[in-house]
Design a protein with these regions (language model features):
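Cell-envelope/extracellular polymer assembly enzymes that use nucleotide-activated donors
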Residues: 2-4, 32, 208
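A conserved acidic beta->alpha catalytic loop
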Residues: 37-47, 93
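Acidic donor-binding loop at a coil-to-helix junction in glycosyltransferase catalytic cores
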Residues: 181, 202-209
Length: 271
């Protein structure tokens, strides 16, 4: 089965380049990348063209810059995706080399997958080279410590140990939820809930999508120690208390009324 990896980007060509390095290093290469672009300039197109020239399968889905419209461009990417199974991550998340393979291994009807991510500092994010990604140094806790990052229990996500991964996935107290940095589902399930709610602003919009999947009968499956990305640091210019409150109100309604289909999703794109 062909998989589609979907992630958004907005005028972050250097971060996008690092993310695409990660996808070029995957052990499972039977996938396409769908870049959901919320209005970036020509620098982003140049990065994508360079990755295409190196053999990575990419669709570039672009819409004009009209403020924060992440959910709208995600819905356009879902429509364009040619895979029957969709992996969602972000344009600031570099995948470990087994990222696609782990999602393929764990996917199952009636479930969506909840993967993990490890936050990098800004200095480490900026210093990350192609060789660091290809050689997977950015997933080694000792290398990160040398770059100034402190060791923590969260570093266990990076190990890639086939022995420990399933145990850690079962033992973690963290509930599996839809995390926009690293989650996946069948395309049919995403379409059944009408995709992402285009009314939502920055903050928790991915969780709302997952809550509707649960309302529709899907069970979340934990793979946060199996499928891993490292998260590049960045400013959050769209974040606001008002936006979080607006989204929280919609999420509360979704949970209370067990809503499955958003009234402002894929089906409304053409209207």
């Amino acid at each position: 089965m062909k998989l589609s990896v979907i992630f958004t980007t907005y005028n972050s060509p250097e971060w996008l380049r690092k993310v695409l390095w990660g996808f070029s290093a995957q052990t499972d290469l039977d996938f396409e990348v769908v870049v959901a672009d919320d209005g970036s300039g020509p620098e982003t197109e140049a990065v994508i063209q360079a990755a295409l020239a190196e053999g990575l399968s990419i669709q570039h889905i672009w819409q004009p810059d009209d403020g924060f419209n992440k959910c709208q461009i995600l819905n356009k990417a879902i429509i364009a995706a040619t895979g029957d199974y969709l992996i969602f991550t972000d344009g600031d998340c570099v995948p470990r080399r087994d990222f696609v393979a782990q999602h393929r291994l764990a996917m199952a009807p009636g479930h969506f997958l909840s993967g993990g991510y490890f936050k990098l500092s800004m200095p480490v994010s900026q210093a990350l080279t192609r060789e660091d990604v290809i050689e997977q140094r950015c997933f080694q806790s000792d290398w990160l410590t040398q770059g100034g990052m402190k060791k923590s229990l969260k570093s266990l996500k990076l190990s890639g140990s086939e022995f420990w991964q399933p145990w850690l996935n079962r033992l973690t107290p963290t509930k599996p939820t839809w995390n926009g940095h690293n989650a996946s589902c069948f395309k049919a399930d995403a379409l059944a809930v009408n995709g992402f709610d285009q009314r939502l602003r920055y903050g928790g919009l991915d969780r709302e999508f997952g809550e509707r999947l649960v309302n529709a009968g899907l069970s979340p499956k934990q793979i946060r120690y199996s499928a891993v990305t490292v998260h590049l640091d960045h400013p959050r210019s769209y974040e606001s208390a008002e936006g979080w409150a607006f989204n929280h109100a919609i999420r509360s309604q979704v949970r209370k009324e067990k809503i499955t289909v958003t009234p402002a999703g894929i089906q409304q794109l053409a209207h």
